[in-house]
């Protein structure tokens, strides 16, 4: 009896950012999650923070700077040039992001950027938290069942 193991296939599988059930369970136990999305809205990375994003200590702006770090047009639209990014405590890849983002500019671009930002804040638990953290379950179920 011989077992054929194709190391290349296994490596490609692991590098393709497959979301395992343990990752899903971990996300559903996290309190403060920020989702990075493709241009079509599909979540690509879940960034986990141990502290809540707040306006009074400006951590919400620092998280936004991290979230849009690779999109200078959005950083400029949201006036985040002088803000230091706040790195997450952990990030979990959900899917591969190989799409180009459209260049955002003007009032419409600002509205799209803000919409994307405010839809990024999620929570995996049902404790009382600020209104801008939406339930995560819907997004994760969509990814796992695809």
Swiss-Prot record:
GO terms for cellular component: virion component. Keywords: Late protein, Virion. Induction: Expressed in the late phase of the viral replicative cycle. InterPro entries: Pox_D2 (IPR006791). The keyword Membrane does not apply. Its main location: virion. The keyword Coiled coil does not apply. It is found in: Virion. Part of a complex composed of the kinase OPG054, OPG092, OPG100, OPG114, OPG115, OPG142 and OPG157. Late protein which is part of a large complex required for early virion morphogenesis. This complex participates in the formation of virosomes and the incorporation of virosomal contents into nascent immature virions. Belongs to the orthopoxvirus OPG114 family. This is Core protein D2. It comes from Vaccinia virus (strain Copenhagen). The gene is OPG114.
């Amino acid at each position: 009896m011989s077992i054929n193991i194709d190391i290349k296939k296994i490596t490609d599988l692991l590098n393709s950012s497959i979301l395992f059930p343990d990752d899903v369970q971990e996300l559903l136990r996290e309190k403060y999650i920020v989702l990075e999305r493709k241009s079509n809205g599909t979540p690509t990375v879940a960034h986990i923070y141990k502290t809540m994003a707040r306006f009074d200590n400006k951590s919400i702006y620092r998280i936004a700077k991290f979230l849009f770090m690779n999109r200078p047009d959005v950083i400029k639209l949201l006036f985040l040039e002088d803000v230091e990014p706040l790195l997450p405590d952990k990030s979990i890849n959900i899917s591969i992001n190989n799409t180009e983002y459209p260049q955002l500019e003007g009032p419409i671009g600002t509205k799209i950027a803000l919409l994307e930002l405010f839809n990024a804040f999620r929570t995996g638990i049902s404790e009382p938290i600020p209104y801008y953290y939406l339930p995560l379950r819907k997004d994760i179920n969509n990814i796992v069942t695809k």
